[in-house]
């Protein structure tokens, strides 16, 4: 006697597949034993996306065994954002190159110290017969930034002594003084030379110029 399988019983076969494959192999089902998985069960699995939806309140086997390991790069970025160091200048050095080289040693050093008072120290060494004609330097520092700008220029001329020295005195009317003195010290061949310029003022009266006399 040959059994007949109707398509109306397909949902029931899918439900029995979820409960267990042993139900189809029982003698009461009237079907021969099936050594391979049911065709209807495979079709139902393929139509459902190939994966079984997890039940609420349960974990997958892989998720329950494997712990969640954070990304080291994300931890480093978060720690760097929290503990970002504040950049402050500590020391500064520079060198000056001379071309052509002088017959004797010439050194020019400059250093910057940053503290509560902010000192700037310059030290110039030169052979005999050379004097500093001009020296200009600019230091630009931006707080909390690694960018620094520094420009220095030194000019030497082979002059043993100053040829000319000019001193200008500006008298401010509100604070009158009688004597203004400017002193220039020059060291040549380790001999101290001093140049002194003095301006002496005397109170005078201008006839017919009362307004000018009041301003002076």
UniProtKB/Swiss-Prot annotation:
Any single biological process term in GO: skeletal system morphogenesis
Molecular function per GO: filamin binding
Taxonomy of the source species: Eukaryota, Metazoa, Chordata, Craniata, Vertebrata
A Pfam family this chain is assigned to: FAM101
Protein's job: Involved in the regulation of the perinuclear actin network and nuclear shape through interaction with filamins. Plays an essential role in the formation of cartilaginous skeletal elements.
Localisation: Cytoplasm, Cytoskeleton
Phenotype of null mutants: No visible phenotype; probably due to redundancy with RFLN. RFLNA and RFLNB double mutant mice exhibit severe skeletal malformations, as characterized by scoliosis, kyphosis, intervertebral disks defects, vertebral fusion in the spine and longitudinal bone growth retardation. Chondrocyte maturation is accelerated in double mutant mice.
Keywords for this protein: Cytoplasm, Cytoskeleton, Phosphoprotein
PANTHER family recorded: PTHR31848, REFILIN-B
Name assigned to this protein: Refilin-B
Species of origin: Mus musculus (Mouse)
Region annotated Disordered, chain positions: 1-55
GO CC, alphabetical: actin cytoskeleton; actin filament bundle; cytoplasm
């Amino acid at each position: 006697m040959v059994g007949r399988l109707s398509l109306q019983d397909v949902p029931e076969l899918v439900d029995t597949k979820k409960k267990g494959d042993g139900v189809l192999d029982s003698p009461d089902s009237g079907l021969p034993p099936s050594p391979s998985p049911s065709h209807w069960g495979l079709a139902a699995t393929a139509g459902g996306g190939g994966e079984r939806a997890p039940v609420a309140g349960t974990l997958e086997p892989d998720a329950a065994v494997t712990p969640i390991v954070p990304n080291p790069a994300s931890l480093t970025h978060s720690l760097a954002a929290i503990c970002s160091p504040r950049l402050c200048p500590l020391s500064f050095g520079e060198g000056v190159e001379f071309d052509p080289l002088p017959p004797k040693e010439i050194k020019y050093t400059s250093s910057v110290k940053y503290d509560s008072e902010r000192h700037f120290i310059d030290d110039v060494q030169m052979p005999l017969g050379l004097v500093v004609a001009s020296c200009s330097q600019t230091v630009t520092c931006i707080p909390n930034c690694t960018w620094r700008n520094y420009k220095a220029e030194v000019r030497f001329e082979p002059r043993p002594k100053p040829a000319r020295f000019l001193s200008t005195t500006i008298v401010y009317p509100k604070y009158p003084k009688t004597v203004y003195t400017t002193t220039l010290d020059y060291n040549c061949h380790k001999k101290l030379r001093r140049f002194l310029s003095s301006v002496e003022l005397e109170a005078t009266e201008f006839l017919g110029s009362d307004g000018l006399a009041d301003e002076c």
